[in-house]
Amino acid sequence: MPLDEIKNFVVVSDRLGTAGQPSEAQLRDVAAAGFDVVVNLGLLDPRYCLPDEAASAASLGLTYHHIPVDFNAPQADDLRRFFDVMDGARDQRVFVHCAANYRVSSFVALYGEARFGWSPDQGDAHIRRIWEPNETWVRFIADARRRETAGA
């Protein structure tokens, strides 16, 4: 099964892919495609997640990180944890997902601005490939950009 069958799959670079929640079969495809690390920003809600994604990832030889981000209340600490995980996996192929790639596209855009030299316009374009952020996320992104500019 091709990776582009995963909900909202996006190839960001040769080392970074993002998407919504993969199925068990799609997680096997992620491993078969050569990804080393899975980062899940979704909540452990049975409506949107696998029964035990950490165990499934481990059984496939994937390093697994779970950073539960509340879609209605994303926190600066969540973003810092994400940056730390991404920085630690710099030399690996990373697959980042949440339920629909909304949280992920926003976090990856901010990471791209901080680490890849993307402009805010490039970050916004990346996000809008997937969705139009609601007011909560517009505010979160703006606050994160202000903190980054201030060096916090």
Sequence positions of predicted segments:
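Cys-dependent protein tyrosine phosphatase-like superfamily
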Residues: 1-95, 106-152
